[in-house]
Amino acid sequence: MEQFRGTTIVCVRRNGRVALGGDGQVTLGNTVMKGNARKVRRLYGDKVLAGFAGGTADAFTLFERFEGKLEKYSGNLTRAAVELAKDWRTERALRRLEALLAVADKETSLLITGNGDVIEPEDNLIAMGSGGPFAQAAARALLDNTELSAREIAERALNIAADICIYTNRHLTIEEM
C-alpha cells in the first residue's frame, strides 16, 4: 500500500514571537486526498504549538503522546520532547511511526524525530517535509533581508514552497504566540 506523504511545515521566531505554519495537502501516491488538513495545532492550554510532517495517523498518535508528556512535566517543552523521543525510539509500537514533529513555546523551538533526535535550531528556523528545503531557503532570506514579522515570514515561505513542491498547497494554517 502506498504511503500518505508530503507536506511543508515551517516555524519562525522573530522579535519575541513564534509562528508555526503548515499547508493542508494530504497526498496518497500521486493523488491529492485532502486539501484542507490541519497539520498545526495548539496544545497544553494553547501554550505550545505543534506541527507534523509524515503519516497523518502516526502524527495524531504522537500529538497525543506529546501532550501527555507536557502534562506530566508541567509544560516543560524540552523535557517533554526528550521523553517523547525516548519513547518513540524504544517502544516497539511507536518505533514504526513515520512522522516528524516541530514544537514551540514562547522560548524554545524543537524538531523531534523518531530516531530519538531533539534538535533546537541555531537560526530561529525549522522547516520540514517535502517542501521544507524551499520554505527554509525562503524564510532564511526573509529573516536576513526584511523586517517582516514571524507570521508574515512563515506565510510567505509556505507560499513559495507551494509554488515549487507538488506535495504542498496554499491552504495554510498558521498559529502564532
UniProtKB/Swiss-Prot annotation:
Q: Which UniProt keywords apply?
A: Allosteric enzyme, Cytoplasm, Hydrolase, Metal-binding, Protease, Sodium, Threonine protease
Provide the gene name from the record. hslV
Report the activity regulation comment: Allosterically activated by HslU binding.
Q: Which CDD domains match?
A: protease_HslV
What does this protein's UniProt record list under function?
Protease subunit of a proteasome-like degradation complex believed to be a general protein degrading machinery.
Q: What is the lineage of its organism?
A: Bacteria, Pseudomonadati, Pseudomonadota, Gammaproteobacteria, Chromatiales
Q: Where is the active site?
A: 7
Among its keywords, does the record have Cytoplasm?
yes
User: What GO molecular functions are on record for this protein?
Assistant: metal ion binding; threonine-type endopeptidase activity
> What is the originating organism of this protein?
Thioalkalivibrio sulfidiphilus (strain HL-EbGR7)
Q: Where in the cell is it found?
A: Cytoplasm
Subunit architecture: A double ring-shaped homohexamer of HslV is capped on each side by a ring-shaped HslU homohexamer. The assembly of the HslU/HslV complex is dependent on binding of ATP.
Name the UniProt record assigns to this protein: ATP-dependent protease subunit HslV
Q: Name one GO biological process term.
A: proteolysis involved in protein catabolic process
InterPro entries, per the entry? ATP-dep_Prtase_HsIV_su, Ntn_hydrolases_N, Proteasome_sua/b, Proteasome_suB-type
